Amino acid sequence: MAYPSTHPAEAADSSVVDLTGSSCPRLTAPSELGRRLAALDDRYIREQFVPLDDLAADWPGGPAAVRADIAAGRLPQPAYRLDDGTDMVPGDYLVPVAVAGSVAALHGWFVREFREAAERVDVPHDPETIEIEWQDYLGGGYFVCLRHATPATMAEKTRHIVDLNQLIADPHPADQVWCKRLRLGVEGLAAIERPFAILDPARWGTPMSGQWYGTFLRALYPAAFAE
């Protein structure tokens, strides 16, 4: 089995040569590699997210009010922070507040929406589980992984991951039905997830779900994705 690609070619310096004069990107110096990875990471974040203060400029009370609500645990934390200290959030960061009606109503809205979505996709939705999901939402991590971090997509992600874990716990790669279920699960998860920033695994200390349940599974079971 060939190893899957986890980094773009530009992450290393193609102009580096070994002692024979042959091209050898793997000899890229650590500092240059770090610079390149940081540049790719920064570019992705700026393309996918917007500065919190810019988004909150026209919000009642402006950025100061939004930051106060974040600090008080009433609104989610940012997705990323840039080198200059700029906090970055998705463009639809404040949409749930508008839908809920107010910051004060956001928690109640989240509980109702998650319960309904979880019932539809058959994942746990007891009060304790919903509170854990709410705290995870406030942590801002779902902005990193989901294209639109809503209670519905959070429940949907859980469903896909539960299904995929069950499939890989008892693999049957020669079974067409198993392969189809694996493919649908991987593709369904990919449809709601962001591509992820190149340094996210270092931030989180683990492979990202898009790698674990996407890149790695596609490499491990290529026949399931041959169609």
Language-model segments: what does each one mean?
Residues 42-45, 52-54, 71, 80, ...:
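A broad "ordered helical/assembly scaffold" signature
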Residues 44-66:
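Polyanion-binding surface elements
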Residues 2-31, 37, 78-227:
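Long, charge-rich, low-complexity intrinsically disordered regions
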